[in-house]
Regions:
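Conserved histidines in hydrophobic membrane contexts and catalytic metal-binding motifs
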Residues: 50
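Catalytic core of pol beta-like nucleotidyltransferases
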Residues: 1-47, 55-61, 72-118
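Short hydrophobic/aromatic beta-strand micro-patches
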Residues: 68-70
Length: 118
């Protein structure tokens, strides 16, 4: 979650609460699919996949949402964090964004088995 600071003002840096509604895979996938064209345009996303507790419909209200991403080209900090913040704002939950290149080899088979392509 990101915080916007106003110059010259002392501010409480406690982050705003994320949405406390539990997301299921259908709701999450629908929102991601509705915004897919924008994600491609803004961040040069090649593809996204949902995995983890949300994909298995086992997420709690305070769960993060796990998303596997592949970019066309390099996963620059601007692309990576821009996408992460966009998705957090869109979905109202913390996002654990994992690039395919950064995916640990021992976890790859499990994630690929449960991943749902957007």
């Amino acid at each position: 979650m990101h915080v916007i600071l106003k110059p010259g003002k002392k501010q409480d840096l406690t982050p705003l609460a994320f949405n406390e509604k539990r997301m299921n895979s259908n709701e999450t996938l629908q929102l991601l699919r509705e915004h897919k064209a924008e994600l491609i345009k803004r961040y040069d996303v090649n593809h996204l996949s949902l995995f983890g507790s949300t994909a298995r419909n086992q997420a709690r209200a305070n769960s993060d949402i796990d998303i596997l991403v592949s970019f066309n080209g390099a996963a620059t900090s601007s692309r990576y964090f821009g996408l992460q913040f966009y998705l957090e704002d869109l979905l109202g939950h913390p996002i654990d964004l994992v690039t395919e290149k950064a995916l640990r080899i021992e976890l790859r088979p499990y994630i690929e088995q449960e991943a749902i392509r957007v």
